[in-house]
């Protein structure tokens, strides 16, 4: 009988995270990005006869910390293997990786999924393994973005030998949105740890998607296809959604899905066939004879575990439960470690959490974006933001004045209290100082006063505006409304 259960996608991600060490994984060659091609190459990177690789200790530390943050079981012993393949970007004709004895296995990551027009939900996505390996070089194809159609190709070995960790998820992901959110949470995690900048545009974080479809959760897995060339989280989501639809259409029209590697074409919003997918046997793995096995003591693991920072998922929970933020605001604030730390320090200095969140996510982020800066560039002290928020709460200044002075506070990193005093921006709060100004307004606009008394009470807003204009916004609007209403009705 034909299975008519709804189609279900089965998705797994292989995420390559470039570690931000100063030197490469097995040599002292620099990892600096953006320098002249082939200036960070040495005999070890090229695999010249007589050279021996030596593991960078910081790479091991960063890899173990990432494993622990992703709830993986770190092995007591692991080893490196040679993955053999011939391609111009690999000067040794093999890549040093880990095959059957990886650094860590069997972990998970809890991800918050915000699907369009659906309630946000939490999903625990399993992680199969994490292993260390070296990156390959970079090919630049002249006249095309890929080998096919290019006139010639240039190779830059600056990237070759840079340390990577590859994080392989279990096939627990079911939608493009889940895939995108999972990758995004991986990036948040490595940024919080400080082990990688996670910059997709520079290749510091790259994701390959393995995807198949089947009829319902009880059916066997279908033939999986690998998708490459996605350089943003939205591209991951769109590539998955396109490929799911493509595979379903093929099956429903009696076709066959082949195990292949496909490329995401951002311009055309579709996947293109690149090559048939190799199996692990095609790479002829064997233990690297130049690198001994690695042993990690329990004491060392415990030390690195204790050095882990509070991670984004825990911060989100804390911001909702302890600070009263909405799930959305807690997600925005915790998205970037610099922003989260700035927010917490602002609150620790006496600011209301909700007001601090609003000022940070709206006004400060808006200012930084307009000046093409990121949050890490912010020079403003959280002490001064807390001070400004409290000046508003104490009615020393209005929200409008605060918005006006914020750019200067950010540029100069100075006390808002001092700036308000120097510029005479403090609110006029005593009635005796405001009433003479109101008297002048009544004398200045006799027609409007007469119209108000005839019943056109909406003119009260006009008088409030004029009062604000004369005082440069330094009167509390509620007090202005009260005093004007009393005077006009007398």
UniProtKB/Swiss-Prot annotation:
Subunit structure: Heterotrimer of A, B and C subunits.
Designated gene of the protein: gatB
Family: Belongs to the GatB/GatE family. GatB subfamily.
Pfam families given in the database record: GatB_N, GatB_Yqey
Function: Allows the formation of correctly charged Asn-tRNA(Asn) or Gln-tRNA(Gln) through the transamidation of misacylated Asp-tRNA(Asn) or Glu-tRNA(Gln) in organisms which lack either or both of asparaginyl-tRNA or glutaminyl-tRNA synthetases. The reaction takes place in the presence of glutamine and ATP through an activated phospho-Asp-tRNA(Asn) or phospho-Glu-tRNA(Gln).
Top EC class for this record: ligase
Protein name, UniProt field: Aspartyl/glutamyl-tRNA(Asn/Gln) amidotransferase subunit B
Enzyme Commission number(s): 6.3.5.-
Domain of life: Bacteria
GO function term, MF aspect, one: glutaminyl-tRNA synthase (glutamine-hydrolyzing) activity
Keywords: ATP-binding, Ligase, Nucleotide-binding, Protein biosynthesis
UniProt feature coiled coil, ranges: none
Annotated GO biological process: glutaminyl-tRNAGln biosynthesis via transamidation; translation
UniProt keyword annotation of ATP-binding present: yes
Catalysed reactions, as listed in the record: L-glutamyl-tRNA(Gln) + L-glutamine + ATP + H2O = L-glutaminyl-tRNA(Gln) + L-glutamate + ADP + phosphate + H(+); L-aspartyl-tRNA(Asn) + L-glutamine + ATP + H2O = L-asparaginyl-tRNA(Asn) + L-glutamate + ADP + phosphate + 2 H(+)
């Amino acid at each position: 009988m034909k299975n008519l259960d709804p189609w279900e996608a089965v998705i797994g991600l292989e995420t390559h995270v470039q570690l931000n060490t100063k030197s490469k994984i097995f040599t002292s060659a620099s990892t600096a990005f953006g320098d002249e091609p082939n200036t960070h190459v040495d005999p070890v990177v090229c695999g010249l006869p007589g050279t021996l690789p030596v593991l960078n200790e910081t790479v091991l530390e960063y890899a173990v910390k990432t494993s622990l943050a992703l709830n993986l079981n770190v092995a007591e012993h692991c080893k490196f293997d040679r993955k053999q393949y011939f391609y111009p970007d690999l000067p040794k004709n093999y890549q040093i990786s880990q095959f059957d004895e990886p650094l860590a296995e069997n972990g998970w990551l809890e991800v918050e999924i915000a699907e369009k027009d659906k309630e946000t939900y939490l999903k625990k996505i399993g992680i199969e393994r994490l292993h260390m390996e070296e990156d390959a070089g970079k090919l630049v194809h002249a006249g095309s973005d890929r080998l096919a159609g290019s006139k010639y190709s240039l190779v830059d070995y600056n990237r070759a030998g840079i340390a990577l960790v590859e994080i392989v998820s279990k096939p627990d992901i079911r939608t493009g949105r889940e895939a995108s959110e999972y990758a995004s949470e991986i990036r948040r995690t490595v940024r919080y740890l400080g082990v990688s900048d996670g910059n997709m545009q520079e290749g510091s974080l790259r994701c390959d998607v393995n995807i198949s479809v089947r009829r319902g959760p009880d059916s066997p897995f279908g033939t999986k296809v690998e998708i490459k060339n996605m350089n943003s989280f939205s591209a991951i989501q769109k590539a998955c959604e396109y490929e799911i639809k493509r595979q379903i259409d093929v099956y429903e029209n009696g076709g066959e899905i082949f195990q292949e590697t496909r490329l995401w074409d951002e311009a055309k919003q579709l996947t293109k066939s690149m090559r048939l997918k190799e199996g692990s046997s095609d790479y002829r793995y064997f233990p690297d004879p130049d690198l001994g096995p690695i042993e990690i003591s329990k004491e060392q693991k415990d030390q690195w575990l204790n050095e882990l920072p509070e991670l984004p998922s825990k911060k989100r929970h804390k911001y909702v439960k302890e600070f009263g933020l909405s799930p959305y605001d807690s997600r925005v604030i915790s998205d970037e470690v610099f922003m989260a730390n700035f927010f917490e320090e602002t609150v620790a200095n006496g600011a209301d959490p909700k007001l601090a969140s609003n000022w940070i996510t709206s006004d400060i982020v808006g200012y930084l974006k307009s000046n093409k800066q990121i949050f890490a560039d912010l020079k403003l002290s959280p002490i001064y933001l807390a001070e400004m928020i409290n000046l508003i709460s104490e009615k020393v200044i209005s929200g409008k004045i605060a918005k006006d002075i914020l750019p200067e506070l950010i540029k100069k990193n100075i006390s808002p209290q001092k700036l308000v005093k120097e510029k005479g921006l403090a609110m006029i709060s005593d009635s005796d100082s405001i009433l003479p100004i109101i008297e002048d307004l009544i004398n200045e606009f006799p027609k409007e006063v007469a119209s108000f008394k005839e019943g056109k009470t909406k003119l009260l807003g006009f008088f409030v505006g004029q009062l604000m204009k004369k005082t440069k916004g330094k009167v509390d609007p509620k007090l202005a409304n009260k005093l004007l209403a009393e005077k006009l009705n007398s």
